[in-house]
Each structure stands twice: as structure tokens, then as C-alpha cells.
Amino acid sequence: MPYTFENSEALLKNLKDAAPYISAAERFASFKGFVYDKRINIACTSEKLARAGFYSTASPEFPASAKCPFCMLEINFEQCDDPWEKHKSGSPHCEFVMIGEIEESELSFRIISNLAIRHATVRLYEELLGIVATLENGDIANENPITRADATRKLISFRSSSKLLTFDHRLATFQNFIFDKKRNVKCTSKKLAKAGWFSIANKKDKTSAKCPFCLVELDFDESDDPWEEHQKFSASCDFIKLGKLDEKKWTENEALMLGARITIMQKYEKGSWLIDELEKENRIDEIIKIRKIMIKPNHVLKRRRCSI
């Protein structure tokens, strides 16, 4: 598929729809009438919260509550709190936190896209939690717009899109795997499937496999250890970070999050290819254009701050 600006523009528009709080400006806009903004010389303002990765989840009971769309950390802030320090201490492995305090204008197209995909994954996970709760409770809460029929349809669709979550489904993709006929080899179909891989073999690349959680593809040799190779080439993969090869040891929430990750990665797989093409060709002008679709400039924050 040849690269065009329209391709990437459509990709990022879809990502932005799936990740509504990707930019500081959009997070800032969620803090309407924030309780501490009318006070002088305080550490915790709506602007600082937004720049630290939080959007408002305020309620009458918790008027200073905010949440990170990338790691789900939710805090009811005090006016003396430093939002960035609270985020770092409360969720040090959050992808947003690990980037550091960098201006959005300095973030690469790849980083912005990865954050959007993480945000979309978390958002789907939270939606799925609501669906599961709806079906388990047997009734619909007044504030929940999901009907049982809607919940059932969405869960069936999710199961279909996340089949490669399980070892058995990944193993089933390795039909007549070439190394299985040999003795004393490290790289077997069972070891590949257990390490998170599914087969994408063809006549040319008979030992190719891919991870549905991170989309890394490798051509394996019979002496390769599938788990070690996965760690080596994709240390940030969600499956690798969980570190539980035995899926029987997964908690329900861990399985649901991994399933959400697969679904989102499938949805934006072609988009990942577009990003690769942009970076290979070093098309700076196009990258700047499409990055603006995702991230609003900082003066949006400053303009609203001056108008309060």
C-alpha cells in the first residue's frame, strides 16, 4: 500500500477519536471550574495536572479527582500536591511518565502514536470491565447506557478479535511447523506459542512468527529460544512485561487487558506500517502535518488560562 498523506491523516484521526485525552490541551479542557484554580500560589492547578498527564474525573464527593488515560492512576489531589511527582510515585512504569517532562512539540510521531494506542487500549479495557459487570450483575444500572444485548454483542466481537490471546489458538496457527520434525531443538511450535508467537509462515519464510501484542515479526532458527528472542526484540511488549507464560496464572483483569491490547493492535496494524514508511523515508514535512492532528499547540492552554 503506497504512502499518502491522506492515509496517515485518516489513521491519526481514528487514533484521536479512540484516544480523546492524548493531548495536554484536551486534558486541560476537561477541568472546567477546577476547585483550586481560583486560589493563589498553589502547586496543583488544572494546567499542571493536564501537563502531568491527567484529565478530570471530578465529582461532588471528590472535586479534585483526576485520572491518567495511559495507566488508569486516579488521585483525589490536594492543593499542595505536585501533579508530576504524584504521577511518578504512583505509577512509575506508566508510558507517559517514562517519557519524562518533555514538551509535546518535541515528541516524535512514533511516541505520540504509541501513547494514543496505549490510551485506546486502556479505554477499551475499561469499557470491557463495564460490559462484564453488566452481564454479571444481571441488571442495568440507571447511569449505564449499555443494554444486555449490546453488552453481549460487544463481548462476542471482542472474543472474536482477541482469539490469539490464548496458547491453544496461537499453537493452532503452526501447521506442520518445520522444526517440529527435528529432535533436540530449542525452537518448537509449542515453545513459540507459549512465548506469545503465532505463525505467519509462507513458502519463502517458513519459520516466520509474529506477536499479536506488539506486532514484532521474526524469522526463527532452530537454535533460538522463543521467549528470549521475544524479550530481546520487544522488551516493552505487554505480554513480555506481564512475564507469565502460563496463562492459567493470569488474573481476569490481566487477561482482559491483554485481550484489549490485541484488539487495538489489530485495528491499527496498517497504521503502524504507515508510521514505519514515514520514518524510513524521513518525510519530515508530512510528519509535522499529521502530528498537529494529534497534538494541539501549547498556546491553546495559555489562551484559556489568560481568559479565566
Curated annotation (Swiss-Prot):
One of its GO terms (cellular component) is kinetochore. Keywords: Metal-binding, Repeat, Zinc. GO terms for biological process: chromosome segregation; germ cell proliferation; mitotic cytokinesis; mitotic spindle organization; negative regulation of apoptotic process. Signal peptide: none annotated. The keyword Cell inner membrane does not apply. InterPro entries: Baculoviral_IAP (IPR051190), BIR_rpt (IPR001370). GO terms for molecular function: metal ion binding. The keyword Zinc applies. SUPFAM superfamilies: Inhibitor of apoptosis (IAP) repeat (SSF57924). It holds the Pfam family BIR. Zn(2+) binds at C68, C71, H87, C94, C211, C214, H230, C237. BIR repeats lie at residues 27-98, 170-241. Belongs to the IAP family. This is Baculoviral IAP repeat-containing protein bir-2. The gene is bir-2.
